[in-house]
Design a protein with these regions (language model features):
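RNA-interacting cores
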Residues: 1-169
Length: 169
């Protein structure tokens, strides 16, 4: 499920433009969103949720010593989402559904939301390179990537955006 930021708090994007798209209209996940999932300090990232007092150091290890790249597509900073047959998801695909619901803000104000959702079965691939350092080791990074699947990626987590990891050497 996607809810891409439009650039300011007043801009309301059309539903299908809330997805992350490349210049060809292929849906995908920006590499920066993976960094955020693993190490953000202002949202429930893996480092914050699973690593307690060590979370800051682990997050710093990800940000300072880990390189993440998409392994498919033309832009190493954007990982195309593929369907179960390996075809890229395009924003024009009729299988993409618009989900409508009401979010409740802390003061109880109803906030109607409308977000595009790609059905389960999507795949994307990333390459993770970790430099030797004292803050983060390979085993912890692998665990963090897998724990990210519990939190989920995108919005309305962890109900949506959960994933599992398949390691490729």
């Amino acid at each position: 499920m996607f809810d891409r930021y439009g650039g300011d708090n007043k801009t309301k994007l059309p539903d299908l433009e809330k997805m992350y798209l490349d210049e060809d209209g292929t849906c995908g996940i920006p590499v920066l969103n993976i960094f955020s999932l693993l190490s953000a300090e202002n949202t429930p990232s893996v480092a914050k949720r699973f690593y307690g007092k060590q979370g800051r150091d682990v997050a710093q290890g990800v940000k300072s010593f880990c390189n993440i790249e998409a392994t498919e597509g033309t832009d190493p900073m954007f990982a195309p989402l593929n369907d179960e047959t390996g075809k890229p998801w395009l924003s024009t695909d009729g299988r993409i559904k618009i989900m409508n619901h009401v979010a409740r803000l802390p003061k109880g104000i109803p906030n109607p939301k409308s977000r595009p959702m790609i059905p389960s079965g999507w795949t994307c691939t990333f390459r993770f390179d970790l430099q030797q350092n004292v803050l983060l080791n390979e085993a912890t990074l692998k665990a963090m990537i897998e724990q990210g699947g519990i939190l989920g990626i995108g919005t309305f987590r962890p109900i949506f955006g959960r994933y599992s990891v398949e390691w490729i050497k």
